[in-house]
């Protein structure tokens, strides 16, 4: 790739190539730890359905000697085991001898109670945030630090796009003498040439899948996702509803809304209409008799599991049920008349807006759930490829780094950013605001600070060649 910083050939490289290589180097330097982290946690999360089926196996095939109690009674048992909580959702037992999973909450906390549907024995109550796959989910997208972690993930993902696109440019064969080192690594090579071959070849094969994973994950991030939602809201009379939360704060706000009854906390709207209404003392109590009617309506529908029934809250003023299989394209949402249990509305995946369908398909594929085990294997190979890409890039750098220096491609004397790079840089900066802001910050810090400190300037390769 003509990239040695010590063999005297660098001055012959075009300014554009030098600049792209430099940005590729720094993008990789920043991204490698995050790529390895996201790849490992993402690979684990691919197998969430299988893991949680194993995790819950103790609550399957329960000994049953008679008919199950009413769902309302099961909910009452769960609430008694978790005092002070409110019903968030009732998950219909997967089989007649499976435990009912009842989700209850208080404030920002959510708990899952496993209840024997016949004896009403509460088998276990666990904080949902402590379930292993929820921990992996939070490690993957937020580093367990909430919105700051989501922003950091988005920043790494944005620079990951720079790394991949610039890497493809550097990989592009300009003097083809065979496919070795282009489409497959030359295994007979040793040392740095071998690692460079491996880095370029793996990068080529994994690039399209890696770009897909990055782009499909952006709607879930705090900064990009929130702005994406704001753009969708333009020109819409009603608030845009999404099936996903953009960051930890949005998720916590949603939990708080679910833990507040629908008819409490709106005093201002009552005063605006000239009414003074005292909230009933039992306003926070859910009419669980409606749950019994709704579950009876759902019984013959054979919706894809799991199926959860949600009571009215400040999130939604009506009872609704949601079929939530891992493949989002198979999900169904229904609303109900609480008095009769009759279905009011039914929304299939095909009924959603186009952008919601695109995001839904993308996330299902991202999580390895769109087309079965092959999707999981493809995701696993992609994450393994990204780890190999990161390690081979590190080794290629480690083998060539000059003693006492970082080994970054030095800048060219009197040469700024080539004109051909301004367009792509501006486009990426607009589409990925965190990338644009960080690029500006890097350029300012480099030019105004780092180049003025001799030791730092030499170490980073900022001394013009």
Question: Each predicted region: which residue ranges?
Answer:
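Conserved histidines in hydrophobic membrane contexts and catalytic metal-binding motifs
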Residues: 1-465
């Amino acid at each position: 790739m003509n990239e040695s910083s010590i063999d005297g050939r660098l001055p012959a490289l075009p300014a554009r190539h030098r600049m792209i290589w430099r940005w590729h180097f720094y993008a990789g330097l920043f991204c490698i730890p995050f790529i390895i982290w996201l790849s490992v946690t993402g690979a684990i999360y691919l197998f969430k359905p299988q893991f949680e089926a194993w995790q819950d196996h103790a609550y399957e095939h329960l000994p049953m000697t008679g008919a199950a109690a009413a769902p309302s009674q099961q909910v009452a048992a769960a609430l008694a085991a978790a005092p002070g909580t409110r019903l968030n959702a009732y998950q219909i037992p997967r089989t007649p001898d499976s435990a009912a999973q009842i989700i209850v909450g208080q404030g920002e906390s959510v708990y899952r109670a496993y209840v024997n549907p016949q004896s009403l024995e509460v088998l276990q109550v666990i904080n949902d945030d402590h379930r292993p796959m929820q921990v992996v989910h939070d490690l993957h997208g937020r580093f367990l630090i909430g919105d700051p972690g989501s922003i950091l993930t988005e920043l790494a993902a944005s620079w990951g796009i720079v790394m991949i696109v610039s890497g493809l440019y550097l990989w592009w064969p300009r003097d083809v003498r065979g496919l070795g080192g282009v489409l497959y690594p030359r295994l007979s090579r040793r040392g740095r040439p071998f690692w460079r071959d491996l880095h370029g070849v793996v990068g080529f094969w994994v690039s399209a899948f890696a770009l897909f994973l990055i782009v499909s994950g952006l709607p879930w991030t705090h900064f990009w996702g929130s702005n994406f939602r704001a753009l969708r809201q333009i020109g819409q009379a009603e608030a845009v509803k999404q099936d996903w939360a953009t960051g930890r704060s949005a998720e916590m706000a949603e939990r708080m809304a679910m833990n507040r009854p629908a008819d409490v906390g709106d005093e201002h709207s009552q005063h605006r209409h000239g009414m003074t209404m005292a909230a009933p003392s039992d306003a926070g109590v859910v009419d669980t008799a409606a749950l019994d009617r709704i579950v009876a309506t759902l019984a013959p529908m054979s919706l894809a599991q799991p199926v959860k029934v949600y009571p009215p809250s400040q999130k939604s003023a009506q009872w609704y049920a949601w079929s939530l299989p891992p493949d989002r394209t198979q999900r169904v949402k229904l609303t109900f008349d609480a008095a009769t249990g009759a279905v009011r509305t039914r929304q299939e995946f095909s009924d959603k807006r186009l952008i919601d369908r695109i995001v839904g398909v993308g996330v299902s594929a991202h999580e390895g759930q769109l087309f079965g085990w092959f999707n999981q294997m493809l995701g696993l190979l992609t994450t393994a490829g990204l780890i190999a890409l990161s390690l081979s890039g590190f080794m290629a750098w480690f083998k060539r780094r000059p003693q006492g220096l970082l080994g970054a491609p030095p800048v060219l004397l009197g040469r700024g950013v080539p004109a051909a790079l301004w367009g792509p840089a501006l486009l990426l900066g607009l589409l990925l605001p965190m990338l644009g802001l960080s690029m500006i910050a890097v350029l300012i810090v480099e030019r105004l600070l780092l180049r003025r400190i001799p030791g730092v300037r030499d170490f980073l390769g900022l001394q013009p060649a």
